[in-house]
Amino acid sequence: MRYFSAIGTVGLLIAIPVSMGLAADAPQPAPPFVVPVAADGVQRATVILDSYSYSPSHLVVQAGKPVELTLTSVTTITPHNFIIKDPAGSLSVEQDVSAGKTVTITFTPVQPGTFPIYCDKRLWPMPSHRDKGMEGKLEVK
């Protein structure tokens, strides 16, 4: 019985530092990007659409001021889209971006809140790009 107890103790002593090391290496989410307001009152930013990710993935904007986003896809084959939908209907943006292309969109958020940004493209029967992690958020203050 002591043999099994000793093995369990040794195993635990090895597992704790290993799991602590793994937790320390976990990627941290990028900090929010506060979109600056230009002299003309427009909030402008560029968002990179890559393989199943947006960068930046968390945008912070001001309510009532126009937002101009330049969406640049850096993928060579896979098309993406950029969707923001408020279930209450105060904000609805949906823009396709072909592989390797750049598109500029403009919208004015009127309601403060946090809204999901996502790509719903998918190749049947595979999971959607959102399911693979291509999502972010728009925070309107």
Locate each region found by the language model.
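Beta-strand-rich interaction surfaces with strong enrichment in secreted/lumenal proteins
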Residues: 56-59, 91-97, 105-106
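Intrinsic-disorder/low-complexity, polar/charged segments enriched in Ser/Thr/Lys/Arg/Asp/Glu/Gln
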Residues: 42-46, 64-68, 102-104, 114, ...
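Histidine- and aromatic-enriched segments that form or immediately flank copper-ligand environments
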Residues: 72-99, 125-134
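Short beta-strand/loop motifs in extracellular/secreted proteins, especially
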Residues: 67, 78-82, 113
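N-terminal edge beta-strand
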Residues: 35-66
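Extracellular/periplasmic metallocenter environments
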Residues: 27-34, 97-141
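Extracytoplasmic entry segments of secretory-pathway proteins
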Residues: 1-46
